[in-house]
């Protein structure tokens, strides 16, 4: 049975809300287009100050819970996670003309496109994870930064696209972090008209369908996309139609639409890299004006300089190292929910493991070589606090785990090991945390004594000394047995490589023509 938050409408998730300010709610996945346009552009136009005034800003995270930032790699680099949010809001006539039901004008917006861009710490690869708009999730409590209105956490599960109406894009960010455990650094949004203008400026993006398509039903519903079988270069409003098409592709679901969006984005990246016409300063200035005028970002990306710095990071990734995926899911009535494979995909992103599998050996080597330069103190001089983190949503904390493991450490010569009796925590995997570089060697020595992998030794400002958190993966025994982890991308994520120029969307037989 579908679960929804009280006071929401199960079918559409719409409700009343104050009229949104101009350009506040922006939409569709072509936000990525704005970033990538800047990524291939020259530097000359980037310093015009007036471009900064084009960029709208909003708060990054409206929830109470924060996710810790990832630990830097050996080179001091950290991954970068950007949430792309697209809204169905039609808050001005220009966007209303581009399609959609007239009755939705000015109503509470829904986040109908949600994609997480993960740029690896070493900037060698880029992963994209799409979440279907009708995914059932728990939306956390969020506070609107404009008027202070507090939106209570959902009672049960609600469709993820409703999160945008709970104070703004920062609530969608909070919802993603609650579900995935992934620290999100930034968000970006773009409007309908921005998609059209920027796609026009590029000059066309090639896409493929395996049959003639007209995505419009007998009642006039649908994007209106009409293409002949084969490859067509689309731009402007036709590009927007492609990004919005649902009925005409595959099974007519939002999952098919996400797949088509991935194909478009991959093709767009290839086109941007190959299109010599973008070397024209006039074209680049036009693109800069359109890109900065179309996007809304958090304050961390709120200037052209910051966007340019981001674009320089993104442009380091070659198309063959870009992987597009969709969150593995299963149907619950007309909605979907994450599967076990979804958590596996989220873990790969959290641990900065490339979804194309090409750096698996490198990751293993780095973990093996991660020994600290800081020598460990003598065992009997190392203070260790052991915490019980075995509690999960399904299981109570395993009784006495902190004292049992602390006792084992004392037997091994760590005389200053003590258990934390203040209460149980919830940690999926066992971790050894340390606050500063001078204790890194001590933390690694403790981990080695118990068989805990070096990848589970983390620097954290939340602790004041070496702290061992016994996780849910170690509910019994005194020697840690690291679970064997499969670091391959789940097949159910339907991965699409950025260099694949042979991909072709399957047309729903009910929407073809001759």
What do the PLM-derived regions correspond to, one by one?
Residues 1-514:
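Non-catalytic, solvent-exposed segments at the cell envelope interface
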């Amino acid at each position: 049975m579908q679960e929804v938050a009280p006071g929401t409408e199960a079918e559409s998730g719409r409700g009343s809300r104050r009229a949104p300010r101009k350009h506040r709610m922006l939409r569709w996945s072509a936000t990525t287009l704005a970033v990538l346009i800047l990524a291939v552009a020259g530097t000359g136009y980037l310093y015009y100050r007036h471009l900064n005034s084009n960029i709208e800003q909003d708060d990054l995270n409206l929830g109470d819970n924060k996710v810790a930032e990832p630990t830097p790699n050996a080179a001091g680099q950290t991954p970068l996670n950007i949430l792309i949010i697209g809204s169905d809001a039609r808050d001005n006539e220009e966007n209303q003309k581009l399609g959609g039901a007239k009755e939705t004008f000015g109503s509470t917006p829904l986040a109908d496109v949600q994609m997480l861009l993960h740029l690896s710490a070493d900037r060698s690869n880029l992963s994209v994870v799409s979440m279907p708009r009708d995914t059932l999730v728990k939306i956390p409590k969020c506070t609107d930064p404009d008027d202070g209105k507090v939106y209570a956490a959902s009672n049960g599960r609600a469709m993820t696209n409703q999160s945008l109406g709970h104070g703004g894009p920062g609530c969608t960010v909070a919802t993603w972090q609650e579900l995935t455990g992934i620290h999100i650094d930034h968000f970006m949004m773009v409007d309908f008209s921005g998609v059209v203008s920027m796609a026009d400026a590029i000059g066309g993006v090639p896409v493929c369908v395996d049959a003639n398509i007209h995505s419009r039903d007998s009642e006039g519903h649908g994007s209106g996309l009409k293409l002949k079988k084969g490859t067509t270069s689309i731009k402007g409003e036709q590009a927007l139609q492609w990004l919005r098409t649902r009925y005409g592709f595959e099974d007519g679901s939002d999952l098919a639409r996400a797949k088509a969006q991935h194909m478009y984005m991959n093709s767009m990246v290839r086109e941007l890299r190959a299109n010599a016409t973008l070397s024209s300063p006039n074209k680049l200035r036009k693109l800069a004006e359109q890109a900065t005028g179309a996007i809304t970002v958090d304050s961390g990306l709120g200037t052209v300089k910051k966007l340019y710095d981001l674009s320089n990071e993104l442009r380091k990734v070659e198309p063959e190292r870009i992987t597009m995926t969709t969150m593995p899911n299963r149907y619950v009535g007309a909605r979907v929910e994450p599967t076990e494979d979804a958590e596996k995909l989220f873990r790969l992103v959290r641990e900065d493991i490339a979804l194309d599998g090409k750096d698996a050996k490198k990751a293993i080597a780095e973990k093996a070589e991660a020994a600290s330069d800081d020598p460990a103190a003598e065992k009997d001089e190392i203070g260790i606090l052991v915490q019980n983190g075995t509690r999960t949503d399904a299981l109570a904390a395993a009784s006495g785990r902190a004292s049992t493991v602390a006792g084992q450490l004392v037997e091994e010569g760590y005389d200053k090991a003590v258990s934390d009796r203040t209460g149980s925590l919830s940690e999926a995997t066992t971790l050894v945390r340390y606050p500063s570089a001078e204790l890194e060697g001590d933390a690694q020595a403790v981990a080695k004594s118990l068989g805990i992998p070096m990848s589970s030794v983390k620097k954290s400002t939340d602790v004041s000394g070496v702290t061992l958190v016994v996780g849910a993966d170690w509910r019994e025994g005194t020697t840690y047995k690291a679970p064997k982890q499969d670091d391959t991308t789940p097949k159910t994520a339907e991965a699409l490589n950025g260099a694949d120029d042979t991909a072709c969307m399957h047309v729903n037989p009910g929407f073809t023509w001759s």
